[in-house]
């Protein structure tokens, strides 16, 4: 018979790395073609003019200009790049 309890193992102690999601460039800021504007899971934001969407739903600029956040006619949050 043991006179001390065995040291039990913990089932906790794990965590995943942060994915660094969110808005990377805000409204009114200047971007060049290829700049990432938003990293997201699913389409919280939709692509507008001069913007495209990657297969992981990342929104990036396809032209140089200024970022504009707005709502489209269907009520969806949309991001566009306004060229100079």
UniProtKB/Swiss-Prot annotation:
* GO terms for MF: structural constituent of ribosome
Q: Which NCBIfam families match?
A: L27
Q: Which InterPro entries match?
A: Ribosomal_bL27, Ribosomal_bL27_CS
Task: Spell out the PROSITE patterns in the cross-references.
Answer: RIBOSOMAL_L27
Query: Can you say what this protein is called?
Result: Large ribosomal subunit protein bL27
Q: Organism source for this protein?
A: Brachyspira hyodysenteriae (strain ATCC 49526 / WA1)
Any one GO biological process: translation
- Asked if the Swiss-Prot or TrEMBL record annotates the protein with the keyword NAD, the reply is no
């Amino acid at each position: 018979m043991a006179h001390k309890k065995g040291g039990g193992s913990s089932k906790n102690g794990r965590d995943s790395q942060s994915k660094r999601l969110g808005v990377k460039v805000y409204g009114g800021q200047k971007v060049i073609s290829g700049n990432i504007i938003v990293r997201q899971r699913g389409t919280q934001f939709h692509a507008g003019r001069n913007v495209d969407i990657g297969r992981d739903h990342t929104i990036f600029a396809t032209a140089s200009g200024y970022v504009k956040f707005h709502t489209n006619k269907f009520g969806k949050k949309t991001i566009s790049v306004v060229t100079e």
